[in-house]
Amino acid sequence: MATFKKFNKDKRPKRNTQSLLFKRKRFCRFTVAGVEEIDYKDVDTLRDFIAENGKIIPARLTGTRAIYQRQLNTAIKRARFLALVPYSDQHKI
């Protein structure tokens, strides 16, 4: 017959309460700036939305609205194709 162990709350890892309380509110930079379309030639803006390993950062982390996230993905892919932005961290420009 199986014996059940009692669950001890004290052994759980404690979360940092300060990080839970002070989460920064995410907002869409493009909505605030009043941008209508994201341009693939604006490399400085595109680099803010590309991770160190070359991946496109998802909207749930950046706070970008869905419309702008789709435009951002297209712009980054076009800039990669034209060699304005590297595909990965291994390709330095």
Swiss-Prot record:
GO BP annotation list: translation
Keywords, sorted A to Z: Ribonucleoprotein, Ribosomal protein, RNA-binding, rRNA-binding
InterPro entries: Ribosomal_bS18, Ribosomal_bS18_sf
MF terms (GO), sorted A to Z: small ribosomal subunit rRNA binding; structural constituent of ribosome
Keyword Ribonucleoprotein: yes
Subunit structure: Part of the 30S ribosomal subunit. Forms a tight heterodimer with protein bS6.
Family the entry assigns: Belongs to the bacterial ribosomal protein bS18 family.
Record's function text: Binds as a heterodimer with protein bS6 to the central domain of the 16S rRNA, where it helps stabilize the platform of the 30S subunit.
Alphabetized HAMAP family for the sequence: Ribosomal_bS18
Protein name per Swiss-Prot or TrEMBL: Small ribosomal subunit protein bS18
Organism of origin: Paracidovorax citrulli (strain AAC00-1) (Acidovorax citrulli)
Lineage, opening ranks: Bacteria, Pseudomonadati, Pseudomonadota, Betaproteobacteria, Burkholderiales
